[in-house]
């Protein structure tokens, strides 16, 4: 099961030197994220603003209940950055169009967010918007329907520390984050294809 309102945004930019950088927030060495181990992502869902705030990233490892869904939906966003201030967030679903119903595993998304938070990958986003050092994280949405059936959706989270949650500037940053996710994903896919061609 995937969220509604799938939206694919394109970008000509591609990440450079994937897998050759140093440590990122969250305990991941991007050099450990070997190309063949990185997940394939072809589509990125429009950012979903979460009606939640956290006192700091240290409080985001536990599920938080959304009031907008009659207490049937919770989120764990697993943020980790260099700011100990309040934050709000967007949930961004991702999937591979060849198998859109397949759930992307949390460890795969954790590796992917390490690439996204790499300083060189983040450079353009940080120049255009006021963001912290590691705004991306691997997140989970938990749902429980009227019959008590539970489901989960793993995705990516983009969090923000701005003083006016979900303002125009905040949304612009989230949309740029969505485009960055797709750009990096396409760069990984292209690099994998080149690698396969070189092995022939």
UniProtKB/Swiss-Prot annotation:
Basic and acidic residues biased stretches: 1-20
Keywords from the UniProt entry: Host nucleus, Virion, Virion tegument
Keyword flag Zinc-finger: no
Annotated region (Disordered), positions in chain: 1-23
Compartment(s) of residence: Virion tegument; Host nucleus matrix
GO aspect biological process, one term: viral life cycle
Cross-referenced Pfam families: Herpes_UL55 (PF04537)
Family matches, as InterPro entries: Herpes_UL55
Coiled-coil regions, chain positions: none
Gene Ontology cellular-component annotations: host cell nuclear matrix; viral tegument
Annotated family: Belongs to the alphaherpesvirinae HHV-1 UL55 family.
The protein's name in its UniProt record: Tegument protein UL55 homolog
Organism of provenance: Equine herpesvirus 1 (strain Ab4p) (EHV-1)
């Amino acid at each position: 099961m995937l969220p509604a309102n799938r939206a694919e945004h394109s970008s000509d930019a591609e990440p450079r030197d994937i897998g050759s950088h140093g440590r990122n927030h969250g305990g991941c060495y991007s050099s450990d994220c070997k190309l063949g181990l990185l997940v394939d992502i072809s589509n990125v869902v429009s950012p979903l603003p979460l009606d939640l705030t956290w006192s700091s990233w240290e409080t985001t490892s536990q599920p938080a209940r959304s009031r907008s869904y009659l207490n049937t939906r919770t989120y764990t966003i697993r943020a980790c950055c260099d700011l100990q201030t309040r934050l709000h967030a967007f949930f961004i679903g991702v999937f591979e169009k060849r198998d859109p119903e397949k759930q992307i595993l949390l460890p795969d998304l954790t590796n992917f967010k390490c690439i996204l938070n790499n300083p060189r990958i983040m450079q353009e986003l940080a120049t255009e918007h006021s963001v912290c050092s590691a705004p991306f994280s691997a997140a989970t949405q938990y749902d429980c329907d009227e019959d008590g059936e539970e489901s989960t959706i793993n995705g990516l989270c983009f969090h923000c520390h701005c003083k006016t949650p979900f303002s125009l500037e905040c949304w612009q940053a989230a949309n740029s984050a969505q485009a960055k996710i797709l750009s990096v994903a396409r760069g990984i896919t292209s690099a994998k294809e080149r690698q396969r061609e070189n092995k022939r």
